Regions:
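Append "Primarily bacterial transcriptional regulators
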Residues: 5, 17-21, 29
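Amphipathic, non-transmembrane alpha-helical scaffold segments
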Residues: 40, 44, 48, 96-107, ...
Length: 174
């Protein structure tokens, strides 16, 4: 389905085309996904699984620098992916609730990162990890949503600036 969405666009791709491409009957599709939105939500969750590895493959870097680097890498990957991918990401974010819910893979990745930073003495303890992860995920998804809806929004510049601001928030003490 992901390849079809990229080739044809999200709105133009039908469930029938997805079933034909996957060589499954419509009934089989609906046994797995109650709605088209459920399928897109599942695609979004699969795409986010790799983010955990991206974040934690940088174990040699301090947590604040790692956060900036991850935001930079996400921006570079998305900007280089083309307009159809931009549409697909926007649709995935909208349907998946922007991935900001506590307990989502995206949120849990950043909770783990913050806790690691606290344990290493690189992140301030003045706010709990869940709250800081809420802010990080909100900033990331907000930047991406702005990019999907505004062709003039510089994702690379703005995600970098968001990453830097978040790094300062994580380390600044009162």
């Amino acid at each position: 389905a992901f390849e079809l969405f990229l080739a044809n666009g999200v709105a133009a791709t039908t469930i029938e085309e997805i079933c034909e491409h996957a060589d499954v009957a419509n009934r089989t599709f609906f046994n797995h996904f109650a709605t088209r939105q459920d399928m897109i939500r599942a695609l979004a969750e699969r795409r986010l699984v790799n983010l955990h590895d991206v974040v934690f493959d940088r174990a040699d870097k301090a947590i604040p620098a790692r956060l900036v680097g991850v935001f930079d890498d996400i921006a570079a990957a998305l900007v280089g992916s083309g307009d159809t991918y931009r549409e697909m990401i926007g649709e995935m974010l909208t349907i998946s609730g922007y991935g900001i819910q506590r307990g989502s893979n995206l949120h849990d990745t950043f909770v783990e990162l913050v806790k690691e930073g606290v344990a290493r003495g690189e992140v301030s303890e003045r706010h709990d990890a869940e709250t800081l992860a809420d802010i990080i995920v909100g900033a990331l998804s907000g930047g991406i949503v702005n990019w999907t809806g505004d062709r003039t929004y510089s994702l690379e510049t703005n995600l970098h600036n968001l990453g830097v601001a978040l790094a300062e928030l994580l380390t600044t003490s009162v």
